[in-house]
Amino acid sequence: LLKKRLESDQELNAKYRQAIDDDLQKGNIKKLPEQELSQANPRVWYLPHHLVLNPHKPGKVRYVRDAAARYQGTFLNDQLSSGPDLLNSLVGILMRFRQESIAMSADIEAIFNKVAVAKEKQTVLRFVWRRTPEEKVDVYQYVRHIFGAKCSPMF
């Protein structure tokens, strides 16, 4: 489905390639060499990916990794522990805002892409991709946490 869509729309194809190239340049993903692929590893998972277009941001293409996609009855998120709930309660946050005369808040851009995944755990975050139909399929691996996977002490 993704292949057909990208082959039929060259502009969309270029934007999708650019999104993956950006992740490669930022160090969020790495292309795996052949010798690393040939090593036996029982913990390997390949994530499907697809594109999402936001009607409110017409020039932006986002590629989404699907940690909830099933394969032979299971999916990656089934295997991850969500860990303890570390979020502060909204009531507590609002009460603390009222305690002082100045309040501050911040938003960290793409926070999941800032958290490194332990090297031995990265094999469950692989995906396949080829830039053009003429090229061979390459295997890539995330080295940073992906949005959509359960937060886990494993990462």
Task: Describe each PLM feature range.
Residues 25, 44-47, 56-61, 97-100, ...:
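Short, well-ordered loop/turn elements at secondary-structure boundaries
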Residues 60-64, 68-71, 98-103, 109-112, ...:
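Conserved pre-motif C helix in the palm subdomain of viral-like polymerases
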Residues 73-106, 110, 114-117, 123:
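Active-site-proximal segment of RNA-dependent polymerases
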Residues 47-51, 114, 144:
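Contiguous, well-ordered alpha-helical segments that form the cores/surfaces of helical PPI scaffolds
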